[in-house]
Curated annotation (Swiss-Prot):
Its main location: cytoplasm. Gene3D superfamilies: Vaccinia Virus protein VP39. GO terms for molecular function: protein-lysine N-methyltransferase activity. Keywords: Cytoplasm, Methyltransferase, S-adenosyl-L-methionine, Transferase. Its EC number is 2.1.1.-. This is Ribosomal protein L11 methyltransferase. Methylates ribosomal protein L11. HAMAP family: Methyltr_PrmA. It comes from Thermosipho africanus (strain TCF52B).
Amino acid sequence: MNKVFNEFVYKISQDQIEKIEEYFFENNIKNYYFYETKEGTFLVLVFEEKQEKIFLPFNLEFVENRTTTSEDWVKNLITKPFEFIEGVYVDPDHNNVDGEIVIRITPGLAFGTGLHDTTKLSAKFLKKYLRPGMDVLDLGCGSAILSILAKKLGADRVLGVDNDPLAVEAAKENVERNNVDVEIRQSDLFSNVDGKFDLIVSNIIAEILIEALKDLPKFLKKDGVVILSGIIDSKLPLFKNYNIVEHWRSNEWNALVIKI
């Protein structure tokens, strides 16, 4: 179905991109992308329905409000395969990609054009800690890129959940494109989760991670592994009382492996 979207376009400078992405991540704003032309760099916010221009705490030059279709929108996103982490490639189409693992993802409104540092950190930890046959929960799965990666790394049961219906829709489409046995559900944290898991990965904002940790032990098998990402430097002290096994950092973002 070729949906019609409402877009707000802003002209920005290159040095604003990181701060904008940081603000959007912390405020759970997923419906955006960036693009460049000879006229400069632009930020586009995308909405499914008619929307008033939203406030952004940046000095941005508003360019226009326009409508576009889902087919045209996808053309503005990732068009070429790229190496996501070592040995793992993301391919928006059926290209002949030479890699250990290839994930075919059509970016949707569940995330922006680039894959965030937090996603890459999560993926690197998944590759390090996941063993074939593990049961994996992806809490806040977004596009399901981590769920799909877990399955391709040899996981047994993989469940991806997200509270955003747009993310769930995009995740299901991506699972189908990759022809993997991954279950996707809509869920507010653990509200629609059953069973126990050897590994739980969650790439969401720090405050929600702290909230999730209250119930997480009920869903973790003995000696299970927990991967937490989406933690900006200023929020890292929130996790000081947890048993941190490993800590990786990229730019201002942190990912932790903890044992409970």
